[in-house]
From Swiss-Prot:
Residues 149-166 have a biased composition (Basic residues). This is Interferon gamma. Induction: By cytokines, most notably interleukin IL-12, secreted by professional antigen-presenting cells such as monocytes/macrophages and dendritic cells. GO terms for molecular function: cytokine activity; type II interferon receptor binding. Keywords: Antiviral defense, Cleavage on pair of basic residues, Cytokine, Glycoprotein, Growth regulation, Pharmaceutical, Pyrrolidone carboxylic acid, Secreted, Signal. The gene is IFNG.
Amino acid sequence: MKYTSYILAFQLCIVLGSLGCYCQDPYVKEAENLKKYFNAGHSDVADNGTLFLGILKNWKEESDRKIMQSQIVSFYFKLFKNFKDDQSIQKSVETIKEDMNVKFFNSNKKKRDDFEKLTNYSVTDLNVQRKAIHELIQVMAELSPAAKTGKRKRSQMLFRGRRASQ
């Protein structure tokens, strides 16, 4: 009886192990489809190094990586937009975009819509240029870490002051 249970356990391991190949994220199959479409599996693609992977390896801190990832995701959205009418890869593109939505935007539609709005602004549009310059000082203030930490210190000091006076 002991050997029978070992054999059944072994067979179960084999079945579960073989299922692992089929349980990949949906984007893997679709990315392979895009590789075939773009002939991206050829050795000449590796010439002159990588586009994104080397950059991502340079940044270890999560906030820095998010900045780089946002630019990379923006690139892919623009790339996919160029091929939106190509029916042979439409399913692959949509699957990958949806998976990016889940992974990068945490399935937050508002965040994704705002991100796409930002990436779709044309820097050659005069109206966009004027609005961007008009908002520049406020945007720069938002970027400054000193402005954010200064507010936090003030509110902490007020809180501590109240505690001391009580």
